[in-house]
Each structure stands twice: as structure tokens, then as C-alpha cells.
Amino acid sequence: MTNIWHTAPVSALSGEITICGDKSMSHRALLLAALAEGQTEIRGFLPCADCLATAQALRALWVDIQREKEIVTIRGVGFLGLQPPKAPLNMQNSGTSMRLLAGILAAQRFESVLCGDESLEKRPMQRIITPLVQMGAKIVSHSNFTAPLHISGRPLTGIDYALPLPSAQLKSCLILAGLLADGTTRLHTCGISRDHTERMLPLFGGALETQKEQIIVTGGQKLHGCVLEIVGDLSAAAFFMVAALIAPRAEVVIRNVGINPTRSAIITLLQKMGGRIELHHQRFWGAEPVADIVVYHSKLRGITVAPEWIANAIDELPIFFIAAACAEGTTFVGNLSELRVKESDRLAAMAQNLQTLGVACDVGADFIHIYGRSDRQFLPARVNSFGDHRIAMSLAVAGVRAAGELLIDDGAVAAVSMPQFRDFAAAIGMNVGEKDAKNCHD
């Protein structure tokens, strides 16, 4: 640990930000562009640690990628044009990079190894290994189906497969593998998960058929390079939405935010709590809906979150818990087993931090009760990001309603998904600074 973030409460928030490009879309654009023939230009690319891990892996597979700030140019190599890497491909902290790239590498004609940091190598990979092996892949994993993944590429055959959970990473892995396989791949989905891959593929000239709870992919297609504009990241915007809702005298505008209906549960849930959130200038960028979001300080109330909302809001739950702590009454969220196998055990980590901040909560194996108060002032305290970017940023938002300074261990881990977080925070009046850990004491 080399740094600590520190926050101070605010008397008001106001301002306007244009949020960074969407992380999920940036990953997918890189991968599809690499598989396409010809040149692709990606505008609004998110240069966060996770997406840069995907880019670096593709470079190691001999894909030409040039980046100038938020514009990335890629010369695609086609479905089987990737070349053997000289070393294991390090996905750092990015589960999306590992799971999606595994679907591509399984069909290549060479061997490769996917590894990551300590956190990533604890995350479950059986969900992708099982169907890829059914397609003909040869994958050797570490104990308990975790990374490193040793992949011996070989020709794949399409399968008929029922997804065991609503996971966009699993679904996208198999769509990519299906494109490279012989025959047809039929995926039977269970519940809603983000559909950026399905929306983006036709922009590259690819085709798939989407029916209710079924996706059909035919192998042997060709993709072609294109010019692609990445929408603003709703998961990133959610931090500033909650900051505006809980800060006094707040009015914040967030421009160009993607409002894909498979991602927008966080907006609905905050509105159900009484949050005043308005969507202005709704339009489309390519296949993705976009809006400018205006958020006002609001008196929130506790709610019970129905299970069907969880997959849609899984990445936003840490910041949602901060909103719940500032809502009057009890908020209940269940069906949270997936939250325990993210970059950290986010359920346990957020519960521990909430309690440190003076918030009463009860936690079970897959649920949490949060006992909120509309007059909440979080206790001044030192809290722990657990090396998790979304927890670090959620705790920074809590700082706007604290009774004094919050110290956040390893706040800089936010760069995994939003290196611009502190710049955006400053633009609307939040106080988030950084100091060296050796100068901080409990």
C-alpha cells in the first residue's frame, strides 16, 4: 500500500461532467476490432488499467494497436491471424479480459497462458471452462477451476448450451467462441445481463439472432473494421449520481451517459428510493441509447430490492449501499452470492466499512439489511478499499456526508476502472485528496 485517499464533507455540490467511456464496451471493441479485417477506430476509449490489460494482451498476440489519448486505432488480423505470445498473458485485475479472451484463444492454433494478479487468480473460471471444453477446447486450470489458464487452441464446434447464471462475461465469451467455431452455437440465457456484445457485433458486419432467452451465433463469418464511438460509462456515473443525491444543496449534470436497459437498474433503484434523477436529450450513439443525466439532492427512503434487479446492477451495488445508508428506513438486498466473487468479497467488505462508518447492518451468506437514516453523518474513520476500485470510489462518495475526514486505504486502485475519478469529483465540488501512507496514522 503506497497511498491513502482523504475526503472532507461538503456543504453543496454542483457542476457538469462528461463521464469517461464505458469500460465494458471498450473491452469488447478492442477484441472485435482485433478479430476484424481492416482498420477500426475507437473513439471515447476508456484508458483504465483493466482495458489497457486487454490492449496489452492483444499486442502480445501481434495485433497492431495505436492509442492517442481516448482514440484507439487497431489493424485487425481476422479470426485466425493472432500469433503465439512469447510469455503468459497477464490480465492484471480484469475478469472481463480473461474470460472474453479465453473464448478467442480456445479456437486459435497455438498454446497460451492467461494469468492475473492475486485477486483475479481467485475468481471462478469454471463457468467458462465447462462450455469451452464442450466446444472442443483444451484448458488446464489451477486448483478449483481458477487461473492461470493453460489453453491449447484447437478447432471448435458449436454447441447448444444453457447458461447457468446471467453473466455477460460468460455470454460474451461463448459468442466470441461461437464466431470462431464450426456450425451454430445456441445459448439459452437465464435472466438479463448486459448486451453490449450483441449490439456491437453488427457494427463490425457480424450477425447473430437474439430471441427471448436465446442467442444463436453462426461460425465462419467475417468481421470488418469500422469507426466506433463509446458511450459514457453508467457504472462510473453512478458514483456521482449518489454523491449528488446525498450531498446537501446538490445539482449535478453528467453528460453522454449510456442508458442501455440491461445496465440501467441503478437509475430505477435510486428513483424508487425517492431520488430525483432526470434523463435529458435522449438519443442513440450507434446501437446504444445515451442521455444527459441531471441529479438533485433528494430525501431517500429504504427499499427492498427484488432479486431480478441484482444482475443488472451488480457493479453498482457498493455505491448503492452508500445511498441506502443515507436513506430513511431499512434497505434489504438479497441474492448476492455473485457479489462475494468479484474483485473482492464486496458484500463482506462493504458491510465492514459501513459498520466502521457507524452504519448498522446485518449480513448473511447472500443478503444485507442496511438500517439507514436520512440525517446520516458517517463517522470520521480510516476505511479499507480491500484493493477494490468500486469500494474505494464508494467510500470516497461517503465522504461528502461524513462528520469529518475519511481516510481510504489504497484509494488509487480506482484507476482500475476510472483513473479520472478525482478529476471528476473535483469538478462537482467533492474533496478527495491523496497522501502517502507513511504520513498517515490511525
Swiss-Prot record:
Presence of keyword Amino-acid biosynthesis: yes
Alphabetical keyword list: Amino-acid biosynthesis, Aromatic amino acid biosynthesis, Cytoplasm, Transferase
Any GO CC annotation of this UniProt entry: cytoplasm
Domain of life of the native organism: Bacteria
Gene3D superfamilies: Enolpyruvate transferase domain
Residues holding 3-phosphoshikimate: K23, S24, R28, S167, Q169, D315, K342
Region forming the signal peptide: none
Residues binding phosphoenolpyruvate, per UniProt: K23, G95, R123, Q169, R346, R390
Pathway: Metabolic intermediate biosynthesis; chorismate biosynthesis; chorismate from D-erythrose 4-phosphate and phosphoenolpyruvate: step 6/7
Pfam families the UniProt entry points to: EPSP_synthase
Complex and partners: Monomer.
Listed name of the protein: 3-phosphoshikimate 1-carboxyvinyltransferase
Organism annotation: Dichelobacter nodosus (strain VCS1703A)
Lineage of origin: Bacteria, Pseudomonadati, Pseudomonadota, Gammaproteobacteria, Cardiobacteriales
